[in-house]
């Protein structure tokens, strides 16, 4: 029962080993916020596991995922992703999830006009409590037929301009722009952390 100087030359079969090209030197915390049913969990699952399900259960409180994000410069960021429930009765608890967040994806459903209106609450809440948090407005469900869409790009752009946010239109169902959202926000997290280091 001693220590051996030899080490296995490769991991056991079936075991995945994720070796980053550069040492992981940064961690980031990202939170998804928005009304219930806008697709926050679907966005997170599409990004982390590349899956989509029409029958996701409603998130109660919050959920946690983690992803290693490969950046353009070859470095990596360990991103902790907090997926929150959108029910109004849980809003007081959600501060536990977004405390010390580096970034927030404030998400709305393009087929539900009220869901964009309600994003203003989250912007104001984060600016009040997490003033250095990077904010990204995410329009979800852009795969729907045009006649079902209640919020056009121009209206969303006006919202983004008013609050100085990053903006993406996405579809968790098709995967459109999902990776771009996380890659862009991760780059911004790294830039912010490097400026404060």
Task: Pin down the residues of each PLM region.
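TRAFAC-class small GTPase G-domain
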Residues: 1-197
